[in-house]
Design a protein with these regions (language model features):
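Acidic/polar active-site rim loop that often engages polyanionic ligands
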Residues: 25-33, 83-90
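Short hydrophobic/charged patches on amphipathic alpha-helices used for structural packing
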Residues: 46-50, 71, 108
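Conserved helix/coil segment N-terminal to the catalytic DExD/H
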Residues: 68-75
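Walker A (P-loop) phosphate-binding motif
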Residues: 1-25, 31-32
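Conserved nucleotide-sensing/catalytic segment adjacent to the nucleotide-binding pocket
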Residues: 32-65
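Short beta->alpha connector loops
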Residues: 65-68, 123-124
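General beta-strand structural signal in soluble alpha/beta enzymes
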Residues: 18-22, 60-64, 118-120, 139
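Acidic, Mg2+-coordinating active-site environments of NTP-dependent enzymes
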Residues: 54-55, 80-151
Length: 151
């Protein structure tokens, strides 16, 4: 969520009119809609995209949850960029993922649906996220793990 707001802020400051779909809210121009799911149902996402175009948005930042991927809420979408920050066992349980492997597999699905992937090279689960990816890969990190070194 924090990353989504940071990326949106960077895009806005760079002159892009940017919509947001995320855990807390959806922002369409001046309109703010409280979120009920991080990744809404696909027909709602399509409705939001249409409203964003009508509001003059030229970019969208969207949080895509493992649940959203697992439930095919973004099936058929091609994202320009996908960002992997980290993977922690916080979505395991009867209402989400049966185990960590299922959670990781669902998260990694994003990188079969984007053109460019930006990955945290310091995360111990990086290899799992790269399994089966079809996107260009860029890594960043604090250690010697990334193509881009963070200072």
């Amino acid at each position: 969520t924090t990353t989504a707001y940071m990326v949106r802020s960077i895009l806005e400051k760079s002159g892009f009119k940017t919509g947001l779909i995320g855990t807390i809210e959806t922002i369409i121009g001046d309109k703010v809609i409280k979120a009920s799911n991080t990744t809404p149902e696909s027909y709602i996402v399509q409705q939001y995209f249409r409203e964003m175009v009508d509001a003059g948005c030229d970019s969208v930042v969207m949080e895509v949850s493992s649940q959203g991927l697992m439930l095919h809420r973004v099936s058929g979408f091609t994202f320009d960029y996908g960002i992997f920050t980290n993977l922690e066992p916080d979505h395991i349980g009867p209402n989400e993922h049966k185990d960590f492997d299922d959670y990781a597999r669902c998260k990694a699905m994003l990188f079969k649906q984007c053109r460019h992937g930006i990955f945290n090279g310091d995360d111990p689960h990086l290899d799992r996220m790269l399994e089966g990816h079809t996107c260009d890969v860029e890594t960043c990190g604090n250690r010697h793990s990334g193509q881009v070194q963070l200072l």
